[in-house]
A protein has these predicted regions:
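ATP/NTP phosphate-donor binding region
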Residues: 1-76, 87
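Short amphipathic alpha-helical segments
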Residues: 30-32, 86-89, 115-117, 233-234
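Catalytic core of DAGKc-family lipid kinases
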Residues: 43, 91, 95-218
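Short beta->alpha linker loops
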Residues: 53-56, 77-80, 108, 165
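Short glycine/serine/threonine-rich phosphate/pyrophosphate-binding segments
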Residues: 58, 81-85, 112, 139
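Glycine-rich phosphate/pyrophosphate-binding beta-alpha loops
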Residues: 163, 167, 221-232
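ATP/nucleoside-binding phosphotransfer catalytic cores, i.e., glycine-rich phosphate-binding loops
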Residues: 208-209, 214, 238, 245-318
Length: 318
């Protein structure tokens, strides 16, 4: 089936709602959209286009697309933008959610969930061709339920992972450094340097699979997908969450752990303790929490993380 036939077979109700979330930098953003628009137009894709002005506008625009009846909504963005869109979709009633198909064209600083499926930011043509084929798979979401310091209750969904502790701190420092330096690469390097002078352990109370642990922990990753390499065996359609709990290793072993993380062998490290579960609870008053790369409000008291199986219709590669 060629691309034009794929679009024609959808019918009028399959017109895409395209939510474009640009990276920082007006010139680069304009060039990126021009390339993508050319790819879409060459394939005869019918779509309506909206662009987010900031991270806060993604959910507002997603709500607008849903209210206007779009059944195929494609997010052009990274992990955080996709997370915002999914959380907006999950606020709809089940009857609405089940009629909406969500697609992704990677365009973020971090595109870990896109990489899991094989979507490549450098190959829009391949990604668009896959989306045109409209192959749908129901995927799981993780959900973290917590209360913030002002007493507000939050239920926040995630596609990729929740990080607690050191990894969340690195992400927070990277975001802060990127605002100051403007370069994502410089921000990443500077955040790693800053971590040398940062605390590496947090008192945590974890309960996973009825195993109760109360001790100092460096970082915890709860993955619905690969979790930036920390939960490499997780898949977002298994009905389970993968959990990696990392105790504080000596300095030399910390460097070894980074090497294993970058080479895809993170679970081989002696300080990494893996679990697989449907839910867990955690309590830590000091550790930051990151949800799909974005910082959560600091939780207070115990919070619960669970799996919600097969709740999103996601467009996957052929």
């Amino acid at each position: 089936m060629n691309s034009e036939q794929g679009v024609m077979n959808y019918g009028q109700d399959m017109r895409w709602g395209l939510l474009y979330c640009p990276k920082k930098g007006i010139h680069e953003s304009s060039r990126r959209w021009s390339r993508l628009k050319r790819t879409l137009d060459e394939r005869g894709v019918r779509y309506d286009f909206v662009q987010s002005e900031s991270a806060d506008s993604v959910e507002r625009l997603m709500t607008m697309l849903l209210r206007n009846g779009y059944k195929t909504i494609v997010i052009v963005g990274g992990d955080s933008a996709l997370n915002d869109a999914v959380n907006c979709l999950m606020r709809e009633v089940r009857e609405v959610r089940e009629t909406v198909h969500l697609g992704l064209i990677p365009n973020g600083v971090v595109n870990d969930f896109a990489r899991y499926w094989g979507f490549d930011e450098r190959n829009d043509a391949q990604t668009v061709d896959w989306l045109i084929c409209h192959r749908v798979r129901k995927i799981d979401l993780g959900c973290i339920s917590y209360d913030s310091k002002n007493g507000t209750h939050h239920d926040r969904y995630f596609l990729n992972c929740v990080n607690i502790g050191l990894t969340a701190d690195i992400m927070h420092l990277r975001r802060q450094a990127r605002k100051l330096l403007g370069s994502s690469h410089l921000a990443f390097l500077s955040s790693l340097v800053l971590m040398l002078f940062h605390r590496h352990d947090y008192k945590m109370h974890l309960n996973v699979n009825y195993e109760d642990t109360c001790r100092s922990v460096m970082t915890v990753c709860i993955g619905n997908a690969r979790g930036y390499g920390q939960t490499p065996s997780a898949v977002p359609y298994s009905g389970m969450l993968d959990v990696s709990v990392v105790y504080n290793p000596p300095g030399r072993q910390l460097l070894e752990g980074l090497w294993l993380l970058f080479t895809g062998r993170f679970l081989n490290h002696s300080s990494v303790h893996p679990y697989r579960t449907r839910e867990l609870t955690c309590e830590s008053s000091k550790a930051r929490v990151g949800i799909d790369g974005r910082m959560a409000e600091q939780p207070t008291g115990q919070y619960r993380i669970r799996i919600e199986p097969e709740v999103i219709n996601f467009l996957i590669p052929e």
